[in-house]
């Protein structure tokens, strides 16, 4: 089975070793055809507390790490600009 990966933006880093990543999904509306943007928020494990708010990151699905955390940060694609 393929490993699920998502790319998103860190929206919260207030927890220890955990960040919240917002992932946008763009798809056309089935009836009207307009592109609809849906945002899903995932809690991801950040072992070294490297990711900061605004960073673009790639997350990878993993075993359950807590009640709501099933993703881990694979890499930081682009750090936020000051």
Curated annotation (Swiss-Prot):
Chain's role: One of the primary rRNA binding proteins, it binds specifically to the 5'-end of 16S ribosomal RNA.
High-level lineage: Bacteria, Bacillati, Cyanobacteriota, Cyanophyceae, Acaryochloridales
Keywords, in A-Z order: Ribonucleoprotein, Ribosomal protein, RNA-binding, rRNA-binding
A molecular-function term among this protein's GO annotations: structural constituent of ribosome
The keyword Ribonucleoprotein belongs to this UniProt entry's keyword annotation: yes
Complexes and interactors: Part of the 30S ribosomal subunit.
Protein name as it appears in the record: Small ribosomal subunit protein uS17
Domain of life from the UniProt record: Bacteria
Record Gene3D superfamilies: Nucleic acid-binding proteins (2.40.50.140)
Organism of origin: Thermosynechococcus vestitus (strain NIES-2133 / IAM M-273 / BP-1)
A Pfam family hit: Ribosomal_S17
Tagged with keyword Metal-binding: no
Family of the protein in this entry: Belongs to the universal ribosomal protein uS17 family.
GO-annotated biological processes: translation
Cellular compartments per GO CC: cytosolic small ribosomal subunit
Family matches, as InterPro entries: NA-bd_OB-fold, Ribosomal_uS17, Ribosomal_uS17_bact/chlr, Ribosomal_uS17_CS
């Amino acid at each position: 089975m393929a490993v699920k990966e998502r790319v998103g933006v860190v929206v919260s880093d207030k927890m220890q070793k955990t960040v919240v990543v917002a992932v946008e999904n763009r798809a056309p509306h089935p009836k009207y055809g307009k592109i609809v943007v849906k945002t899903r928020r995932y809690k991801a494990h950040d072992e070294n507390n490297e990711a900061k708010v605004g960073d673009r990151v790639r997350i990878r699905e993993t075993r359950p790490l807590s009640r709501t955390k099933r993703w881990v940060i694979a890499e930081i694609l682009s750090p936020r600009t000051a």
